[in-house]
Amino acid sequence: LGDVYKRQTLNMEAMVSVRAAYGTIVEELKDVSRSYKEADMALEVGRVFYVEKKILAYNELGIGRLIHQLPASLCEMFLNEVFEDGKADIFEEEELTTVYTFFDNNLNISETARRLYVHRNTLVYRLEKIKKLTGLDLREFDDAITFKVALMVKKYLTSRGIDL
């Protein structure tokens, strides 16, 4: 609670939004430069994938850090394999909300339906619609990961000014 209060106070008083990042802890002076570069990367990755986070740790960036280091050409090739013609924009807002909520609830259909205030069958219908569009069954872990990474890759490319 104290951290939240301090952040809100800082944002209100200074009228700016502050973000901070840190790299790995180092023991020797010669490693400070590396830790600084990690913190800088954490800020870059955070701008793309973790917009809501105000404090970013390099070692907690997860898959976002990996995607950030991939060449754009490889990302484009991946999107072309996952989505027809690489077009990840074929999904409506409702479908994307469904997918993100489904992922947030660890692929649990019942809990996702409850959170979205829809009937379980409505959720299954939406997931089937996505399966028809992509060939990916998001109820299957491997397909869900592929789709999640594809959405992150699309977000990364968009942040770099590359629209597919």
Question: For each of these PLM feature ranges, what is it?
Answer:
Residues 3-164:
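Cytosolic nucleotide-utilizing catalytic cores of signal-transduction proteins
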